[in-house]
Amino acid sequence: MVTNRALTYVNSSTPLKIIENEIDLDNCYGDKEIVVKVHAAAFNPIDFILHDFANKWLVGSKPKTIGRDYSGEIVKVGEKVDKEWAVGDKVCGLFDAVYNEQGAMRDYLVFDPESSRTKLLTKLPEFHDAQHSDYVLGAAWPLVFTTTIQGFTDYGQKFGPDSNILVLGASTSVGFHVIKIAKELYNVNAVVGTCNSKSFERNKEVGCDYCIAYDTEDIPVRLKEVITDELKGQKFDLIFDCAGYNDLIPHINDYLKPKNQNSQYINITGTVKYQFDPKKQTKGFIWKSLLGMCRFHRSFNYHFLLMRTERSIGPKFKEFLSNGHYHPPIDSVTPLDQYKTAETKMRSYGAKGKMVISFE
């Protein structure tokens, strides 16, 4: 018997809480399942949004484990599991289950690696990082990289040296990946990013060619100047909205290339940015987001991107990693028993990189 800690909640009115139970590693899995000893797991904003929307009448009274991104070691393998997976394998992946007893933030995960919810499972890459372990970095990329790469590949676009990309929310984890993938995988002409003026240096180091400060500049006006003066009148092939910023929508033709050129506007947050602070929360967040998307999506190519778990993502990530210029950005690594520190920072949108929880 081993102790299995899990970071859980019951519904939106209950705070996160570590619970413990005993599990028998010899009898807790089926013939088609594996058991992963989790070494690290990472928070994403969606984890806390799901917590906040966990209506007690809809989600039931059982504890739900928070988290999706994880890394660890396989410690048990069922008899009918594909020979690709073996005891001792170091792995990382995404456990894409909503309001489930299991989630990434627990000592042991038990699952079928062929399930649609867990197909994003891959051998842990070697990152050769002097500051963080492979386990920490392995837990930092699955959700954000998957979201980003699907935004680049799902809609038939071809990117190259003539392409221009706008990232709304360049300092977010997904924004970071949009910049890196655009510059290093697709070698685009220019990436323009919006961010706080304090983040200019960081985002330019990542690869952003032009930064626009949302705290000191008028974004629509400044964007027009960049298009005219820096991009020689060429508009954007892709606008990737990681921040829920809508001020460009009324005059989208000033910024986005024509629809018949297969230009795309991709949104990953909804049209209204979610506020974790109850005093700032937007009433009707879900409905306003849905109505906003329905209202304008027909006039140009607009997509609200919903990430999918796919086995093919692992090889794509390793290809991206192989160029040697990429490490997932880490804000901090926090022991499980100090999770409240990480939660507070996530809910304030203060993280500059991934908030990783250590299970070592």
Swiss-Prot record:
The keyword Mitochondrion applies. GO terms for molecular function: oxidoreductase activity. Keywords: Lipid droplet, Mitochondrion. One of its GO terms (cellular component) is lipid droplet. Belongs to the YIM1 family. Disulfide bonds: none annotated. Its main location: other. InterPro entries: ADH-like_N, GroES-like_sf, NAD(P)-bd_dom_sf, PKS_ER, YIM1/Zinc_Alcohol_DH_Fams. It comes from the Eukaryota. SUPFAM superfamilies: GroES-like (SSF50129), NAD(P)-binding Rossmann-fold domains (SSF51735). The keyword Mitochondrion applies. Signal peptide: none annotated. This is Protein YIM1. The lineage of its organism: Eukaryota, Fungi, Dikarya, Ascomycota, Saccharomycotina. It is found in: Lipid droplet; Mitochondrion.
